[in-house]
Regions:
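Structured soluble/peripheral alpha/beta segments that form catalytic or ligand/cofactor-binding pockets
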Residues: 4-227
Length: 227
C-alpha cells in the first residue's frame, strides 16, 4: 500500500544502467522506500519496504551494500564492491584467515532527508567489518559470530558515519560450472540490522540516532566470484 509521499520523485521507481568496460556492467530498477502492509498468521503488520531488480552482464565480484529506513521517511544506502582474497572462497564459511584485506573498487551512497527535502549523493564509501564482541554478541545458527559494520559515506558537502550490527543471517550459495571443470562460487549474505549509532553532518547541522523514533535496515555482504 503506497504512502502519500510516493508521488515525490525520490520515491518513484529509479532505473540506472552502469557500464564499467567492454559493455559489461549491471542494470538496476528500484524503489528506495515505500509503505507496506503484511499479513502474518492473520495479523496485519505495517512497515517500510525497499524493492529492486538487478540484471548483471559481468562477473559478480565481492560487495557490501546496505539500506536504512527512518521513521520520518528518510532513507540512506551504501554500496562498495571491492577486491579481496575472499574472491577465491569456495564455500559459505565466514571469518576466513584470507579475509584480511579489502580494496574498494568504487564506493557510492545516497541520503534522502525527508525533513529538508534534500538528497545527497555520495561518491565515497568505506566499510569495515568486524566480529561482534560485546557481552550480548549474537551468532548465526552455526555458532559463528555475526558481523558488525562500520560504514562511512561522504562527498564535499556532507558525510554520514554509521555503526550497525547484524541480528541474524540468511545466505544463498551459487556454484556455477565454467570451463575445464572449474566451478565459480558466490556466497550472498543478507543481514537484518540493529543501528548502534549514526552521525550525519551537512551545511545545515548534524543529526544522530536520537533524532529518530526508529531506524531499521538491511545489509548485504557477498564473497567469491561468479562468472
Amino acid at each position: 500500500q503506497w504512502s502519500s509521499s510516493a508521488a515525490s520523485d525520490v520515491y518513484k521507481r529509479q532505473y540506472r544502467n552502469n557500464v564499467y568496460f567492454l559493455g559489461m556492467g549491471y542494470d538496476i530498477l528500484r524503489l528506495q522506500a515505500t509503505k507496506c502492509k503484511l499479513l502474518v498468521d492473520g495479523e496485519v503488520m505495517e512497515g517500510t519496504g525497499y524493492f529492486q531488480k538487478v540484471s548483471v552482464q559481468a562477473p559478480s565480484f565481492p560487495w557490501f551494500w546496505g539500506m536504512l529506513h527512518f521513521d520520518d521517511g528518510s532513507y540512506l544506502d551504501w554500496f562498495m564492491p571491492h577486491v579481496t582474497p575472499m574472491w577465491s572462497a569456495r564455500d559459505d564459511e565466514p571469518w576466513r584467515l584470507r579475509d584480511f584485506f579489502r580494496s574498494p573498487n568504487i564506493g557510492t551512497g545516497v541520503f534522502h532527508d525527508r525533513k529538508t527535502g534534500n538528497t545527497q549523493n555520495f561518491n565515497n564509501c568505506t566499510v569495515e567489518l568486524s566480529k561482534q564482541n560485546s557481552p550480548d554478541a549474537l551468532k548465526d545458527e552455526k555458532g559463528k559470530p555475526l558481523p558488525e559494520f562500520l560504514v562511512k559515506v561522504w562527498n564535499e558537502e556532507s558525510s554520514a558515519n554509521i555503526r550497525v550490527r547484524a541480528v541474524s543471517r540468511a545466505r544463498w550459495v551459487f556454484d556455477q560450472p565454467t570451463r575445464a571443470s572449474w566451478v565459480s562460487h558466490l556466497t550472498y549474505n543478507e543481514y537484518p540490522l540493529e543501528v548502534i549509532s549514526i552521525n550525519y553532518e551537512d551545511s545545515e547541522g548534524s543529526r544522530n540516532e536520537s533524532d529518530y523514533e526508529w531506524i531499521h535496515g538491511n545489509a548485504e555482504h557477498a564473497w567469491g566470484v561468479l562468472h
